[in-house]
Swiss-Prot record:
Multifunctional enzyme involved in mRNA capping. Catalyzes the formation of the 5' cap structure on the viral plus-strand transcripts. Specifically binds to GTP and displays guanylyltransferase and methyltransferase activities. Together with VP1 polymerase, forms an enzyme complex positioned near the channels situated at each of the five-fold vertices of the core. Following infection, the outermost layer of the virus is lost, leaving a double-layered particle (DLP) made up of the core and VP6 shell. Belongs to the rotavirus VP3 family. The keyword Transferase applies. This is Protein VP3.
């Protein structure tokens, strides 16, 4: 169970030794005040997955604690030791809708008309309150706008990178606003995968897990079903000199112009439709960049020709390189990685481009006030110029992603014609991406339009990353690692495909079979199947797993997401059963010491059950002793030893303990302790001594005679 530990000097649990930390871990409450010393504070920070607020010594922690008190209770997401994000927002108390999403910046004035008159939209990029405006503004716009896609495509608002003003009455605006605010602030009293509370928890812990996973793996990976949320991680991973085989699914479907035009005329506009043009350029930029990494490795320089206005540049402050942009229309970009040249890029500039650089070209001449004849002439001149620049750059071993136009008759495409999915405008554009000089292929106008129309139904991940579907025939090198985060568990994948991936080194996520009740009270199953009931979560259906059965069959380490984050500096304090489970098969740092995934909280399930029914701790000792003798005086003589309470916890509560430790790792460590006379561990938490083989045998006798479990790890531990 993730805990919030508030370190102070005035009140709380005295935590002076590593044994005190073990005792603290078994306390049942989530929020604990603690009085620590430097040593125990360091252990809590580094060797637990708890969220730590040192309100005595850390100014940022004091600020966070004040915010937490105003929002209590709420989820907390820690991106490092001191930068945090809370799971709700109190800016609404001042009638402010707080957002951080940069693509809204050019739309704020018109978006404000979708809110009640006495409400404001404010941007706070680095607030520790959750930016609910990033979600709320989608909802109010989608429910109040009256335009169709086709009307928006031909509107002035589209040209101005904004949205149409709201034409609804204030009564209707207030009605929609009340609906969404009621949803966002609905108190969570049970597991509800459709709630905003759940959505925030899953979104943010997923981001933390992605960061942690990509910091662990090196070399070559097979990445199954990456979403666009992984884009930053993927670019940083490739920029570090690693490589990726992508596995995605192409969802393109054949269509025709009349059908797609009818769709645009009948379909109501959404915010996703509004944003697609900005996202198109960003996705095209990164599609070409990924191609460069795969071909040449790290680019010497990165260029963007035809950059205005590109509001998406504010979304990518994280890129590990500068982007040199060219456009005579200047815009100040709130991103210090952007170096803007407010001039045209012409043929003379080609010589200044370094070899093995990456260039994205999206030159667009303003033709809005021209007649059709002039437009066609300019389109052709522009396309010829872009092709000339691109091919000359490609001759310098540069990767060039560049805009093209579809013309009547035959068209020359340099490589495959590329069409971004889900575009609103049935225009005449496509893209080429080349890494060297290539001979053009001839496409008829009708062929290109057919490809454009079918691409509308494809998914963005397949377009940007490429790759093929992962299945049981996929070949994985044994020196590679399979990464499947929130993807392989989807029921579109067969169990045979999933088991194929599990065979290799991997990090794979699954939902836990249990999502209601208390994590400390998960009953053992009567079957041995690792895969259990299918789970509906948000818009997806996934295979869920039973951690104990899974670990027994596949021999993998199994922990919850919150526990997994202990491998780095990020932390997540969320409802326990919102956690997904992470399956790990790979070499891990410091596997045997207590540095990572130690047995903190191992007593929580037994204490929870004992306290729930007021059962004396003595009952457990007597019950075990009666397995071998009715002489209970032996208990005192042996100081209540002779059995392993920890092993009982592992065997009876394995599927619970994944929420606080790695029970599988405990078994491997216990097995090793049987062959080592004494193991020194400077990271040790808890004063307990290693058990003997006899004590483990006694414990298994007790479990068997009392029929406490259906299956055990006896052969793993003692075989």
């Amino acid at each position: 169970m993730a805990k919030l530990i508030i370190i102070n000097s005035e009140k709380g649990e005295k935590v002076e030794t590593h044994e005190d930390i073990f005792k603290l871990s078994n306390l049942q409450q989530r929020e604990i005040y603690a009085i620590t010393n430097e040593r125990t504070k360091s252990i809590l920070l580094n060797q637990t997955f708890y969220t730590i607020l040192d309100i005595e010594n850390e100014p940022k922690d004091r600020v966070a604690f004040d915010s937490y008190n105003s929002l209590f209770p709420t989820s907390i997401f820690s991106y490092n030791r001191q930068d945090r994000l809370f799971g709700t927002c109190n800016h609404v108390l001042d009638n402010n809708i707080h957002y951080s999403f940069a693509l809204f910046d050019s739309m704020v004035d018109n978006l404000s008309t979708y809110l009640p008159n006495d409400w404001n939209i404010i941007k706070i990029p680095d607030s520790i309150d959750y930016p609910i405006g990033n979600d709320l503004l989608f909802y109010v716009f989608d429910n109040l706008v009256h335009m169709t896609i086709d009307q928006f495509v031909n509107s002035e608002e589209k040209q101005m990178n904004t949205v149409p003003k709201c034409k609804e009455s204030q009564d209707r605006i207030k009605e929609v606003f009340t609906d969404i605010m009621s949803h966002l602030y609905m108190p969570a009293i049970d597991y509800d995968p459709q709630s905003y509370n759940y959505r925030i928890s899953r979104r943010e812990i997923g981001n933390l897990v992605r960061d942690q996973v990509f910091s662990l793996v090196k070399g070559h990976i097979h990445l199954i079903g990456p979403e666009m949320e992984s884009l930053r991680n993927i670019i940083m991973f490739l920029h570090a000199g690693n490589s990726i085989t992508f596995h995605t699914i192409d969802t393109s479907k054949k269509s025709n112009y009349i059908k797609e035009l009818e769709f645009n005329k009948k379909t109501k506009l959404t915010m996703a439709n509004v944003l697609i043009n900005q996202r198109k350029n960003m996705n095209n930029f990164f599609k070409g960049l990924i191609k460069h990494y795969m071909t040449y490795g790290i680019p010497n320089k990165v260029y963007y020709i035809g950059a205005y206005p590109s509001y998406w540049l504010e979304l990518i402050t994280w890129v590990p390189f500068n982007i040199i942009t060219y456009d005579p229309k200047y815009r100040h970009v709130d991103n210090d990685k952007i170096i803007w040249h407010d001039k045209l890029f012409d043929r003379n500039d080609i010589e200044t481009i370094e070899s093995k650089s990456y260039i994205y070209i999206d030159i667009r001449t303003d033709i809005r006030k021209l007649d059709m004849t002039k437009k066609q002439r300019i389109f052709k001149e522009e396309d010829d110029m872009i092709v000339e620049i691109a091919t000359k750059l490609a001759s310098k071993q540069c990767t060039v992603m560049f805009k093209r136009k579809i013309f009547p008759g035959n068209n020359m495409s340099f490589g495959d014609p590329l069409f971004h999915p889900k575009l609103t405008q049935l225009g005449r554009e496509y893209y080429n991406c080349i890494t060297t000089i290539v001979s053009p292929s001839i496409y008829k106008e009708s062929e290109l339009y057919s490809l454009l129309l079918s691409a509308r139904s494809n998914n963005v991940s397949n377009y940007v990353y490429g790759g093929s579907k992962f299945d049981q025939s996929s070949i994985v090198n044994y020196n590679s690692t399979v990464i499947a985060l929130y993807s392989l568990s989807n029921t579109v994948n067969s169990l045979e495909t999933i088991e194929h991936a599990i065979k290799f080194n991997h990090i794979i996520t699954f939902p836990h079979r249990t999502d209601r009740g208390d994590w400390r009270n998960i009953e053992e199953l009567n079957n041995l199947s690792p895969f259990q009931n299918k789970k509906r979560q948000l818009e997806f259906e996934d295979w869920s797993i039973d951690p104990k059965n899974y670990a027994m069959k596949f021999g993998c380490e199994i922990v919850s997401e919150s526990v997994f984050l202990q491998l780095g500096h990020s932390r997540a304090l969320i409802p326990d059963l919102y956690n997904h489970i992470i399956s790990i098969r790979m070499e891990m740092p410091l596997f045997y010491p207590d540095r990572f995934f130690s047995h903190i909280g191992i007593r929580q399930p037994s204490i929870f059950k004992r306290d729930s029914y007021m059962t004396s701790r003595l009952s457990a000792y007597i019950s075990r002793q009666l397995t071998h003798s009715i002489d209970l005086s032996v208990l005192k003589k042996n100081h209540f030893e002779g059995y392993s309470g920890h092993l009982i916890a592992i065997e009876t509560s394995f599927s619970s303990l994944v929420f606080t430790m790695s029970p599988y790792r405990w078994l491997i460590r216990a097995k090793k302790s049987l062959t080592k006379s004494k193991i020194r561990d400077k990271f040790k938490i808890g004063d307990g001594q290693p058990h003997t083989r006899e004590e483990f045998e006694n414990t298994y006798d007790y479990l068997k005679i009392n029929r406490l479990v259906n299956s055990t790890f006896h052969s793993l531990l003692l075989g």
